[in-house]
A protein has these predicted regions:
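Alpha-helical substrate-recognition element adjacent to the catalytic core
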Residues: 9-12, 17-118
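Asp-based, Mg2+/Mn2+-dependent phosphohydrolase catalytic module
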Residues: 1-16, 20-47, 129-130, 135, ...
Length: 161
């Protein structure tokens, strides 16, 4: 999507942000939420908190970037002044009590995010404006339209219809 994003001079790190459901993970939880409402969604997430969600369309990309992030963190672990070369964030509308299934899913894929923002339905824009990712991936246009950061719509699943 068009943007007026300007990278800061001297900024050497790469920041990438992902939505979770319908992007990193499949959209089975989103389908439950849209078809049966918040209460049914939350109960299912509690009941299945130890069962990972299916992979989403960008799971492979997220996983590979996560491995690079781990290698980079290992490289700088003994240097207190080390600036990470890559930082991955998950910025999701999820909140309590559905966070455990998100964590279970990330662990099952062997993935790691440097930052995890569980917004519990709050707007993503304020977090993204502070985080300033170089790119943000989301499956819902409403989360991207007012952003001033480079964003990519992932047309996947129930939200692409």
């Amino acid at each position: 999507l068009p943007t007026s994003f300007q990278d800061e001079e001297g900024d050497t790190g790469l920041r990438i942000a992902f939505d979770f459901d319908g992007v990193v993970a499949g959209d089975e939880a989103e389908k439950k939420f849209q078809s049966e409402g918040m209460k049914a969604f939350q109960q299912e997430e509690i009941d299945k908190k130890m069962q990972p969600l299916q992979a989403g369309p960008l799971q492979s990309l997220f996983s590979k970037l996560s491995q690079l992030q781990k290698l980079d963190a290992e490289r700088g672990k003994d240097d207190p002044y080390y600036e990470p070369a890559i930082r991955i964030a998950v910025v999701t509308s999820r909140g309590a009590p559905s966070e455990q299934r998100l964590i279970t899913t990330l662990k099952s894929f062997g993935m790691y995010a440097a930052e995890l923002f569980l917004l519990d339905g709050m707007p993503k824009k304020p977090i993204l404006n502070v985080l300033k990712p170089h790119i943000f991936f989301d499956d819902q246009l409403k989360h991207l339209q007012e952003n001033t950061i480079p964003s990519v719509l992932i047309p996947f699943g129930i939200n692409s219809k």
